[in-house]
């Protein structure tokens, strides 16, 4: 998959710790790309490398086919996991100031700051100090600061961490809008159901290496056959756990999700379900992103 942001062969060590190990992937325009991995997988180091905030031992970061230059980074927007707002500064002044740092005139920065604070439902806190805001509203202001200069690339490290559903929806809508407007959007999250809803593409890494990348739909349609089975009166899938070559991947709301190993016939599973009780549901199912993630990380 090609895109204007290309990371090729990135490597970085911190003493004996290998943070990035020949990591390569691209981020396309017009799509939201989810960047996934366990804690310590190398996601934050990768994002910092895009902005030149960590020195690489090897590899290249390219934008539109050329090495990223300082002028390019002025067209990038970054929301780091460790939030970078000044606690004692007024919200409006903070966002406007960051717009000026990215080359906007004072008037342009003021107009853009008001626009994004309104869009993210925090315009009423324009004259409040950042430190007086709730965690969720600080997240919204941080996103406004990343968007104030209308960036071509938006990189967000755990932007929805700790947010309530309203905050998640608000930020998710903005990311989708940015992608539809032709921007590149890359964001990391441990909330896999959220990534599944928002993203068309995912990159899964661990130990600084890419394990899996591609279209969410294609990844979910691959892998071993899966069944969703609901048996009247069954709450824990005990009947399925006794079947050879069948793995119970999830039990939720009375439905049992099963993974069939090679050579296992679904009719065998159906017969076992019928012996356990009245079968209310028996259907083939796609992999969920959470299953793709677990299988990739488990190896």
Task: Cite the ranges covered by each PLM segment.
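ABC transporter nucleotide-binding domain
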Residues: 170-260
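Solvent-exposed beta-strand sheet faces enriched in polar/charged residues
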Residues: 8, 230, 283-285
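Short, flexible helix/strand-to-coil boundary loops that buttress conserved ligand/catalytic motifs
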Residues: 72, 220-223, 293
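Short coil/loop linkers at secondary-structure junctions
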Residues: 105, 123, 246-247, 279
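ABC transporter nucleotide-binding domains
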Residues: 2-5, 12-206, 212
